[in-house]
């Protein structure tokens, strides 16, 4: 399973959001990288009780009864429901009624909660109109309005899981009724192509608001997501706006970029060699890289029954298992064989599956490429702000990260960039499309990029595009599935290193697959089977979703790049 290898708080000033709907707490300024810092308490640093309460915290007992009793096929239904009364009143009614003959839990929930509506039910695709008109229509279908500050007279506002945002936003679609962090970068690609720059700015402003309010960007704008983030694409969003609007965007979002960097590096300065805390890992060399992490070690509220059942199949202590599962959710790759440890002795399986998940033990190559981009973006923003010392400090941190990541993740025998197990001091043998990120973000050498391109062509390239991994496990982030964001980043990386014929092949195969499925079904999907394009994609903890934000964004970007009309 593994191949052996030889052995700060930053400046924060609040920037104004025009017509901002919600107040933002003031935060003391802090020092530049490398200097002694003064601790500043933020919501991300405070105990969970200081954050908005989640459904499990609000409805103890009832929550477990509903989720473990599978009252709804999807556990996400209940956590997205809005209570019609205060929690104390609902809990009192449940305790009175639950022992009565004929009590029906679903009927009780439907009386006391407003269940989430499927907003896409009324939408019907017009296949005859074509793909581009469909994409234009979907921006409206998937758009959600800004939520103003809670009305003081609304006594139930604090008990809903949805976190208000000051700007309009785009949801992915299907069961995903809220904004998602890394999805939104790829959605923004399409918004900018569609000349909806203001909506792209709205998304970026919403994430800056979340960073200011909570100290980081949560997985999504739900109270039950406030224990973890997702792949940090905020710097990429700012760069998209800067490319379109100029360097003033770097200054506008600089405080939020610095605040997010602080979140990812929390505790790094105090780490001893070979240890980790939160999202930071200090290697034996002294270099610091990062991992995915969740502050909770309990079952995910939105997948509670699934997590409880899966923990019973694992030999790990439940808290450890749940932490790994949640960290995988933070990665966006939930779930994939890239996170799984070795199989038990005597097993014919190449890995131990979900019971052997070990996400927090791994230093992911893709995460550290994104943080490299964040450091370079901060260096650039500091130069624009005429702060050369800060610019040099961030640039140095980026180069230190690059050197450490390349040393640990590059497998010269496989010709691939792979995750690194910091506990075992071993590189993973699992090849995944995360290995294209060093090309996408310019960390790879030309020779390394050429070898990755060769590996993509011989192993990952399928009739519908690039397969996510080379293992077929039944997990949705494994073979035979392909995902829009990974296709796009692979294409970008190949073009960056002059591997244009392969980039063109990947793009055209992905476009053809998207078009074929749309013509047959009238839908654009969350993921696709790229091995057998005539078969729907599978895996995951929920049915295949349509919509779909990041698919739409990548599709429009590639249509304009390869089939501009």
Descriptions of predicted regions:
Residues 357-387, 394, 476-489, 493-501:
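Long, repeat-rich segments with strong aromatic
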